[in-house]
From Swiss-Prot:
It comes from the Bacteria. It catalyses: ATP + H2O + 4 H(+)(in) = ADP + phosphate + 5 H(+)(out). Belongs to the ATPase alpha/beta chains family. This is ATP synthase subunit beta. It is found in: Cell membrane. It is a peripheral membrane protein. ATP binds at G158, G159, A160, G161, V162, G163, K164, T165. Its EC number is 7.1.2.2. NCBIfam families: atpD. Keywords: ATP synthesis, ATP-binding, Cell membrane, CF(1), Hydrogen ion transport, Ion transport, Membrane, Nucleotide-binding, Translocase, Transport. GO terms for molecular function: ATP binding; ATP hydrolysis activity; proton-transporting ATP synthase activity, rotational mechanism. It comes from Bacillus sp. (strain PS3). CDD domains: ATP-synt_F1_beta_C, ATP-synt_F1_beta_N, F1-ATPase_beta_CD. GO terms for cellular component: plasma membrane; proton-transporting ATP synthase complex.
Length: 473
């Protein structure tokens, strides 16, 4: 076992000198363990990751926890391998830190549990799945207008309080119930309170048993925030590669991954690039994103919450992320204020899977007609606000009439929100979704009151609600 000594500490970056030229490999984990000898010292159990070889038998490392209490001359031990984290069934229902140590006070992970290194190559070209396959979510607005691809990457945009967390929980629930799939949630550089709330909400809604959670939150050093996404990805890869599952990987927030990299970049001695970001920004993002894919065995579909600094979409961090995305789901506050949940914007959300050769001609035509109707309604709203509905042509009145029904029908009750709403959640297969919207566009339900279309699953539920009101169907 190779041993070295600390020779310099610069915040989260630590330089270590090894004797006799036995340098640890890049990405190797090094350990510093020190027992406090008096009340002025603190116990130290710190993991470092080798980032650079500086020459003169010295390596530069990134700390995975606080470097408080480190002093020059402390002994460092090379573990001989990268950071390795537990994988498999033992991770489900548990909460981990970047090193794969449980932090939920539910006991230790068994010593014989399998552990995999967090740094691994992306699947080889010949291992990738060749067919584009849609991942049915059971959420109408997503499946119809911005469908997810198995093994795809989805960007989730939305401010505070518009329903990102509830949408994430519903996706976890539906994948577990309908596809038997598991989910991994990686909390990257977000608020500890939000992570704690999510854990308890998932416990209450019953989806925690199909989920592994990994957190490297805002208060942690950049090393932990930079690597925690890889820890979550490694856990998800096991379920794909060893168990042939279709899993979900949630990363909240992918911007913080880039931000953490830029924090340590200058300390590592790299020349910053545009706006102070690390020069290796595209490489680091590519190494993470290329591992998230479909193979012949299974798939990892990734849903990544994306913070856009100052709403500037040309900022290098979000711009680098966009090039990897297959679909975007945009949550709109105005829709949430209208009581339309999920508050997904049907005109801004996009997907490369919305093409006739992938979803089929009928689905494609219905989706485009829905978007055209909603777009026309949006254009007419200014006229309605100034002059009122009476000034519209008969054709435009019909557009408004149907657009409002479509807008309400894009909403539905979620299983994970049952405890708050008292209404049972609904999972709607894609075929039923397409049929429902097609019939609305054809005018089959023009005679039904528009408020009956709100928060329902299949189109038959609208008819039943109207009948209950005594409306002729």
């Amino acid at each position: 076992m190779t041993r070295g000594r600390v020779i310099q500490v610069m915040g989260p970056v630590v330089d270590v000198k090894f004797e006799n030229g036995h340098l640890p490999a890049i990405y190797n984990a090094l350990k510093i363990q020190h027992k406090a000898r008096n009340e002025n010292e603190v116990d130290i159990d710190l993991t470092l990751e080798v980032a650079l070889h500086l020459g003169d038998d010295t390596v530069r490392t990134i700390a995975m926890a606080s470097t408080d209490g480190l002093i020059r001359g402390m002994e460092v031990i090379d573990t001989g391998a990268p950071i390795s984290v537990p994988v498999g069934q033992v991770t489900l229902g548990r909460v981990f830190n970047v090193l794969g140590e449980p932090i939920d006070l539910e006991g230790d992970i068994p010593a014989d549990a399998r552990r995999d290194p967090i740094h691994r190559p992306a699947p080889k070209f010949e291992e990738l799945a060749t067919e584009v396959e849609i991942l049915e979510t059971g959420i109408k607005v997503v499946d119809l207008l911005a469908p997810y691809i198995k093994g795809g990457k989805i960007g989730l945009f939305g401010g505070a309080g518009v329903g990102k967390t509830v949408l994430i929980q519903e996706l976890i629930h539906n994948i577990a119930q309908e596809h038997g799939g598991i989910s991994v949630f990686a909390g990257v550089g977000e608020r500890t309170r939000e992570g704690n709330d999510l854990y308890h909400e998932m416990k209450d809604s019953g989806v925690i048993s199909k989920t592994a959670m990994v957190f490297g939150q805002m208060n942690e050093p950049p090393g932990a925030r930079m690597r925690v996404a890889l820890t979550g990805l490694t856990m998800a890869e096991y379920f794909r590669d060893e168990q042939g599952q279709d899993g979900l990987l949630f990363i909240d927030n992918i911007f913080r991954f880039t931000q953490a990299g830029s924090e340590v970049s200058a300390l590592l001695g790299r020349m910053p690039s545009a706006i102070g970001y690390q020069p290796t920004l595209a490489t680091e993002m590519g190494q993470l994103q290329e591992r998230i894919t479909s193979t012949a065995k299974g798939s990892i579909t990734s849903i990544q919450a994306i913070y856009v600094p100052a709403d500037d979409y040309t900022d290098p961090a979000p711009a680098t992320t966009f090039s990897h995305l297959d679909a975007t789901t945009n949550l709109e506050r105005k829709l949430a204020e209208m009581g339309i949940y999920p508050a997904v914007d049907p005109l801004v959300s996009t997907s490369r899977a919305l093409a006739p050769e992938i979803v089929g001609e009928e689905h494609y035509q219905v989706a485009r007609k829905v978007q055209q109707t909603l777009e026309r309604y949006k254009e007419l709203q200014d006229i309605i606000a100034i002059l009122g509905m009476d000034e519209l042509s008969d054709e435009d009145k019909l557009v408004v009439h149907r657009a409002r029904r479509i807008q309400f029908f894009l909403s539905q009750n979620f299983h994970v929100a049952e405890q708050f709403t008292g209404q049972p959640g609904s999972y709607v297969p894609v075929k039923e979704t397409v049929r429902g919207f097609k019939e609305i566009l054809e005018g089959k339900y023009d005679h039904l009151p528009e408020d009956r279309f709100r928060l329902v699953g299949r189109i038959e539920e609208v008819v039943e609600k109207a009948k209950a009101m005594g409306v002729e169907v």
